[in-house]
Amino acid sequence: MGVYALNAHAVASRAAQGWLVLDVDAHDKSPSDPQGGIPRDYSKIGDTNRETCYFLHMYLRDSRVLDYLLTRPDWDGKTIVLMGTSQGGQQSLMLAGLRPEKISAVLVCVPAGTDLDADLHGRKAGFPNWPSDNPDVMRTALYFDPVNFARHIQAPVLAAFGFIDTVSPPAGIWTALNQIPGPVEPLPMIESEHNNLTPEKEQNWAVRSEEVLEALRRGEAFRPRTMK
């Protein structure tokens, strides 16, 4: 996944709708420094041990962000929505499973990092494409894989996936969704690759995620639509 600056405009737009918003950088860097010295191959750092893996502190930062939001006097005391695309979707699924009692809804688009041992089961693995022939790496991968957290998710989930996405293959996303015990709304984007290169390809996600957010903003429950 790329290393880039946070989108202040997107956060301001959500705030204008009445949301208390916190955009979380996946990396430990200053907002004023888009690259922050993060190496291009950061996903390989410490990948043979879960205590040294780069993703450990990424996940811990997410949890601490939630701790902070829960202390805000302007929080309504009940609604926490996790929303993200690609690696942001990966972190959203993880946090929903790590802190299930706090989360109201999860909205993810092409979540990365799922089904990391897919190569061993006849499926295509996606980012971070860790080597499946290294047992130590695979043990680490399965610990950080959102599939490992999905079985603990209690909140309703909206999950969009592109049928021609090779970064976050749809089979891997389904593997995670199948572990979630609660209600899930799969949202297929049939002609979409990773990160939806045109507005038309991501139309399903754009429309449905806004519908869900608006319902939640009005204080209504998100009730996922099941596939027929």
Model-flagged regions — what are they?
Residues 155, 169-178:
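Short alpha-helix in the alpha/beta-hydrolase fold that links the catalytic acid
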Residues 89-136, 188, 196-199:
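Hydrolase active-site cap/lid region
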Residues 153, 159-161:
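Short beta-strand/loop motif that positions the catalytic acidic residue
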Residues 163-168, 195:
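Acidic catalytic loop of the alpha/beta-hydrolase fold
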Residues 42-86, 103:
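Gly/Ser-rich "nucleophile elbow"/oxyanion-hole loop immediately N-terminal to the catalytic nucleophile
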Residues 175-228:
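C-terminal catalytic histidine-bearing segment of alpha/beta-hydrolase fold enzymes
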Residues 6-60, 118-125:
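Cap/lid segment of the alpha/beta-hydrolase catalytic domain
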Residues 135-149:
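Active-site nucleophile elbow and catalytic-triad environment of alpha/beta-hydrolase enzymes
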